[in-house]
Amino acid sequence: MFKKLLLLVVGLLVVGGIVAYPKLKQLQVVTPAYQVPGQLVKLEQGWSEAQRTQFHHTAQGTRLVPYDWFLALEQPCFLGCEPFAKQEYLGRFGFLAGDSDSKLNPDGLPVGLARQTDFSDPVSGKTYAVVGLSCAACHTGELHYKNYAVRIEGGGAMMQPTEVQKALGIALVMTEKLPWRYSKFAEKVLGPKASEADRKQLKAEFGAFIEKAKSDLTKVQSRNIYPNDAGFGRTDALTRIGNQVFGGAMNNWDNWAQGNAPVRFPQVWDSSWFTWVQYNSSIADPLVRNIGEALGVRAAAKLYGPDAKEFKNSVNMNGLKTLEDLLCGPEPYAGLRSPKWPSVFPALDAAKVAQGATLYEEHCAGCHLPSIEKLKADLGSATPKYWVSNSSGKRFLDLLDVQVVDVGTDGRAALDFVARTADSGDLGKGRISAGVALELVTKGIRDQYFMRAGFSAEQKTEWMGYREENAEAVRSKPIYKARPLNGAWAIAPYLHNGSVPSLYEMLASKEQRGTPVFWLGNKQFDPVKVGYEQKEFEGGTRFDYSLPGNSNSGHWFQDGPRGRGVVGPALTDAKRWALVEYLKSL
């Protein structure tokens, strides 16, 4: 049975005097029932079991709450409440079952939740254990088909990070305000024989943590910062990173920007060897990219005051290096590999695959490049067509950048980043573009770490993914990148903003695609159209095309002039199905 967690607002206000959640909607946590996975199928993607576990649970310096608090918290209810950290609860938000590992994950937390025992708060100067999100939370997928759960390492997760943080916030406030909950919580954190001084200290720290969270929440809501509920499988990544860096870390609420450009969680295989990454082709240096990502999911930094230019931060640089090494490997295609169509899915039609291969070369390869086999052969060529080199001697895949106006897809993700500016405050650069500001901060954190570690030039180059130290690392242009489509069958929904539910619908004309109602959050996989089940279900996310950033326009196949959303000729239904079959084979 699907469940809806509705907090009893009147009773809670009377008993607890909760002021951070004045509206009923803010006291609701609505999730689907836990989607129990079937038999776990792990595909060959170039990783050992130990490497999978490393990716799932390596800390990158982010913080949700202190670790012992997280384990002690109960779910947001009144009586008979189970632990917040229970897999069956967090799984309702889309978190996948984690790996058992005495060092990395001793308490069996889900994939993408990581324990860090030496988190260093740059504001307070304190060091303590925390639980935080890692990149695996958003970049590990799972497709349910019949009685199988097919794990996709590096694929987009069908999870809802903002809703779980909302639930966490409500659980914290309930714990503070309801005496019987707080007593149980304090005993779990401190033990039954804690001193009065320890109890007072916990009470003070807990209260201060919640007051800061309430204050921040009130400011975010008063500015209507996130009007588009991204829902399952999406987040407004660049806006959130900018808000955490330019707003939170710089201590300047006027630097916060409204987030109207949610994007789906992208696949991350091969991307370490692209010339530029992000949907808008905005970041080159992998270390800069990963520092920005960590800051966006609540790694702490202090970029204000007389010590602003010291770039004090909590980013776990060794953790980022471990994660990046897993993804990239020593050479292209030697790290995390894209998944192959699994044997538990219906077998591919060889004749359709062959027909689709010809169609792909005609209509897709011009933007998305040829097959991986051809790219690998080109990598070893003396005069490669698709790869470029720099002073390190390494080769990088030179992806095609397409103007927003030409591909015709929703432009907010690219255009908002181009238009955004930030007051650099105590960093002393005045008002600058978001791209310049993000490079200033991420390179500042990177270079401070290099200096303290005493790195040689060779070590710096390795840590930067063999990019050049003084090369442009962040840019902002009105473009989207076209990447190779190996593994594309495993990354629904489609387009950068997840507005097209299946591969079949990606190959449509404007009229054929339309604006069909579909729902996000169901992990049941449709191997025919290639996408998740689209039907309405309680607790799911209804995709609303009327919201800013949610258009499914562009990338149409229809006759007429190319450009302004048209990328290829009209395809017969037989050709569409042949292309779908070929894309399954990549």
Descriptions of predicted regions:
Residues 8-16:
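Core hydrophobic alpha-helical transmembrane segments of single-pass membrane proteins
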Residues 4-5, 17-586:
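Periplasmic c-type cytochrome electron-transfer domains
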